[in-house]
Regions:
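Short, surface-exposed, polar/charged, turn-prone segments marking secondary-structure boundaries
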Residues: 15, 53-57, 89-93, 137-141, ...
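Glycine-rich phosphate/nucleotide-binding loop
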Residues: 2-10, 16-22, 26, 106-110, ...
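Low-complexity, intrinsically disordered basic tails/loops
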Residues: 24-36
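Small-side-chain structural scaffolding
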Residues: 11-15, 27, 44-48, 63, ...
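Glycine-rich phosphate/diphosphate-binding loop of Rossmann-like nucleotide-binding domains
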Residues: 33-99, 108
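Structural alpha-helical scaffold elements that stabilize or flank donor/cofactor-binding regions
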Residues: 102-103
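Short beta-strands and strand-loop turn motifs
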Residues: 25-28, 61-67, 113
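Intrinsic structural disorder
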Residues: 1, 24, 73-77
C-alpha cells in the first residue's frame, strides 16, 4: 500500500541513476528549482524510505550535493539543509557530497534543489553519451580494435543500455 511519508509536503523528481556498483536516487532532479531547506530535508526522508523499502538498502546513506565536503561549504540553502539533515533522526545523513564522488558509491540518495539536480542529471547524460562515442572511435581505429570490439560487444551493449538516460 502506498501512502504519504509523515512530514513530507513536496514531492521531488527522483530518478535512480547508475553508479559504479548499483544505483543512487537523485532528489530533486528538476521538479523544484527553488527550494527551502525543509524541502531538502524532506527529499532526504523520501530518499531514505525509497532506498530502504524498494531497493532493499538496510541503512541508506543520504548525502547533500555541494561544492565541497566540509560542513561550511555552499550557500545559505546548503548550510540550513545540512543542519536540518544532521539533526533528523529518521535519515542516515553522511554530509556533503561533491559531484565527482557521486558516481562512485558516495551515497545511496543525493539531495539538492531541482536546479542543481537537473544540471547533475544532464551532465550525467552528456558524459555517458560522450564516453560511448569515445569507445566507438577507439574500436574503429584498427582491425585489432575491431576484433576486440566484437569480443566485448554484448557487454558494451549492456553498458550502453545501463547508461542510457531513457532508462532512468
Amino acid at each position: 500500500l502506498v501512502k504519504r511519508i509523515k512530514g513530507v509536503k513536496r514531492v521531488a523528481f527522483a530518478p535512480l541513476m547508475p553508479k559504479s556498483e548499483s544505483f543512487f536516487m537523485l532528489a530533486d532532479g528538476g521538479a523544484n528549482n527553488e527550494c527551502r531547506p525543509e524541502m531538502l530535508e524532506q527529499f532526504g526522508m523520501m530518499g531514505s524510505v525509497y532506498m530502504q523499502k524498494v531497493m532493499g538498502v538496510q541503512k541508506p546513506r543520504i548525502g547533500l550535493a555541494n561544492v565541497g565536503t566540509e560542513p561550511h561549504k555552499g550557500g545559505e540553502l546548503q548550510h540550513a539543509a545540512f543542519a536540518l539533515l544532521s539533526e533528523n533522526k529518521d535519515v542516515h545523513f553522511i554530509g556533503n557530497i561533491e559531484a565527482r564522488d557521486i558516481p562512485f558509491d558516495a551515497a545511496d540518495a543525493v539531495v539538492c534543489d531541482g536546479f542543481t539536480g537537473n544540471i547533475l542529471l544532464k551532465m550525467y547524460e552528456g558524459v555517458a553519451m560522450a564516453l560511448m562515442n569515445k569507445f566507438k572511435a577507439v574500436f574503429k581505429k584498427s582491425l585489432k580494435n575491431k576484433l576486440a570490439a566484437e569480443m566485448v560487444l554484448n557487454d558494451m551493449k549492456a553498458m550502453k543500455k545501463e547508461l542510457d538516460y531513457n532508462e532512468y
